[in-house]
Amino acid sequence: MNVLEQFKQLDNMPEQYKTMDRDELEARARAVKEQLGRRLFIPGHHYQKDEVIQFADATGDSLQLAQLAAKNNEAEYIVFCGVHFMAETADILTSEEQTVILPDLRAGCSMADMADVFQVERAWAALTDRFGETILPLVYVNSTAAIKAFVGRNGGATVTSSNAQKMVAWAFSQKERIFFLPDQHLGRNTAYALGVGLDEMAVWDPYEETLQGNGDFDKVKVILWKGHCSVHENFNVRQIEHIRQTKPETKVIVHPECSWDVVQQADYAGSTKYIIETIRNASPGSRWAIGTEMNLVNRLMHEHPDKEIISLNPYMCPCLTMNRIDLPHFVWALESLSEGTVVNRITVPKEVAFEAKLALERMLALA
């Protein structure tokens, strides 16, 4: 069986849901929500489709959703409208009596897949051999539970785009150097904002198993994993220059998963929560070019018709893995619960969850 066939087998939704029209699907979703009541909790990430996010009991960015999962001790079922690592995080932070479900198991994250724990352990061995015990690992929540466990085991913590500066500052209070993974751009942008020079950063290439950079490696303060977000890689300086030339009154706001060059050229940079709040608080008639996932950009356009909002990249498409959570899969997961069947349960092994929770709790204690 090839990889494509294995991937297709992850989707075992009955055919009947694929042929239902939207009105029927929405009616069925409402019926199950009413039936299960407080036994059901539906968190939704800002990048989710409107057809799904309308049923969310709470929406947020990665930090907000982690906090919600940690505080929720009432719901029996948590149907997570996000991607795999978010559902894993929810399972880690909730009790054994609670069940976490991901409507479509194909909803992964390409960035999280750019680092596996075996690569990370080899990198750590090489880096600690060179730098000794002067390094602390920090991992973006966009990562597997196994890597979070590795970080927790080695005294580190998780970070989100909302609290990255606070967490990097904390890490520097613990050790001289930081090993930041898997998103090199968030790590670089955050460290630079805190005064770390580009010549004080280096990149670890997991395939070459080498440290890469232009500075003196003995003076390196931040070691970045060579990973990135496939969505935010599609924003570039040329797009900003085009906005400056054709729409000079337009402000550019981007997510810190964008490259350093893009963040430096933008007017504002911050998490999804920051972007949402900035647009919400902006003056009527203001003009904005937003560099982040398209579902969120489209939602902001709809919610703020008094402002001129466009995507920084006119050819941008939504995050393909976030888009896996669609209305048919969502309703199938809900109706299965109403019939007493759990589909697509996300379960993190206890020994992994224990150490991963250490990394998450260190972050949440500072949040």
Curated annotation (Swiss-Prot):
Statement: the UniProt record of this protein carries the keyword Cell division: no
Positions annotated to bind iminosuccinate: 45, 62, 140-142, 161, 255-257, 272
Keywords: 4Fe-4S, Cytoplasm, Iron, Iron-sulfur, Metal-binding, Pyridine nucleotide biosynthesis, Transferase
Cofactor: binding details: Binds 1 [4Fe-4S] cluster per subunit.
GO CC term (a single one): cytosol
Gene3D superfamilies with a match to the protein in the record: NadA-like (3.40.50.10800)
Primary site of residence: cytoplasm
One MF annotation (Gene Ontology) recorded for this entry: metal ion binding
Biological role: Catalyzes the condensation of iminoaspartate with dihydroxyacetone phosphate to form quinolinate.
Full protein name: Quinolinate synthase
Species: Geobacillus thermodenitrificans (strain NG80-2)
